[in-house]
Amino acid sequence: MEKLLLPILDKTFVENLIPQKAPFVMVDKLLAFCENEITAGLTVPEENIFVSENIFQESGLVEHMAQSVALYTGYQYFLKNEMPPTGYIGSIKSIKIERLPKIDENIETSVSVLQEFMGVTLVDIISKVNEEIIATSQMKTVIAS
């Protein structure tokens, strides 16, 4: 596999970096990546399973945040020519949702890795639409063994 230039807007490529599969994929672009940080994106499609009355629901936004962390891990594994691992949300320490995105809005989510140890990743997450912060969270994700 060759290293790709960022941003990566190929939805199929991005989907292959995470364990989730359609219709449960909540990230569709990898915008930036560096040590301990990633910015992922999602343009909310009308047919998304978490859309109700043209609004992307809380559960979808939380899953988007978690999949942004999974994308960080998956891209790390891609760079090492390894298959991405399966993981899950271990805990959510805090989450604050200011507003929910609408269909066709572009969510940009920045993940800052605070700590990684034995498959557990502690992160701060900020989700924005048009530079407006719509949600923040601190969560732990765990790689399944």
Walk through the language-model features, giving the residues of each:
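Conserved positions in beta-strands of structured domains
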Residues: 28-31, 98, 112-114
